[in-house]
Structure formats: C-alpha cells, structure tokens
C-alpha cells in the first residue's frame, strides 16, 4: 500500500525525533509500496505501510551487513 506525501512527512518527522537525528530523510521509491530511509544521504533501510483490520502501521526494515560491523575487542571474546 503506497504512502501518501503527508504520511512520508509524518513518518520522517517521527524517525528524526525518535533517533534525535535531523539527517534522516525518506525518499519515495518507484515501486510505490515503500519509501527508502537515508541518513546523511546513505541508504539504511525501507519503511513499509501496512493496513490490517482498519489500523495502519509502518514497519522500518534495516539490514546490517556483517562486514560493516566493528571488530570485537579482545576483552569481549572471553
């Protein structure tokens, strides 16, 4: 289900307030079923809209690649 422009603005505002990060932006996708989430211009995930039993919710999906994780300090391996 596509997000309207007002929903995109509201979800973007919510995420900015939640994470205290003004560099979060939501960008419409050509598919229309979701929007991309960017932080400082870098893609980090996708928001999908769901409507079930008359209630609307928004799901934020973010994949984290293992290669992007920091190395584990030696003190944490024990």
Map each language-model feature to its residues.
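Terminal leader/tail segments of proteins
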Residues: 1-78
């Amino acid at each position: 289900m596509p997000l309207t422009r007002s929903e995109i603005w509201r979800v973007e505002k919510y995420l900015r307030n939640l994470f205290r990060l003004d560099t979060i932006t939501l960008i419409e996708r050509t598919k229309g079923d979701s929007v991309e989430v960017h932080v400082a211009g870098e893609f980090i995930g996708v928001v999908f809209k769901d409507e079930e039993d008359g209630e609307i919710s928004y799901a934020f999906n973010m994949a984290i690649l293992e290669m992007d994780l920091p190395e584990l300090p030696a003190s944490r391996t024990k």
